Amino acid sequence: VIPQFMIQGGGFTTEFEKKPTNDMIPNEADNGLKNLPGTIAMARTSDPHSATAQFFINTANNRFLNHTRKSQRGWGYTVFGQVISGIDVVRKIEQVETGAGGIFAKDAPQQAVIIQSVKLISK
């Protein structure tokens, strides 16, 4: 959890143990969607096509994460969703106390934050 940047999840248990994942998926950040506040995007490593289970909710206008070109530095991060209701909950998560946890030196919630449900509104 990094205030005024993003909230990341999907890859670890509440005890900071890494979850198993499926195969990596191709980067689709050239879909025209932007990393704006409230949007949800796929997290990845420095390999543009390495996204698996981790995602993040943008809590700021993170235009530097947008696709600009099909190059190592320009691929960007694939936006695939948006928080339609519950942005107040996102803002509350953004304010939780963070610090070291598991493999993370900082920015890990000091109390478990669990997203209990999400709904697909449309494709």
Language-model features, listed with the residues they occupy:
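Cyclophilin-like peptidyl-prolyl cis-trans isomerases
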Residues: 1-123
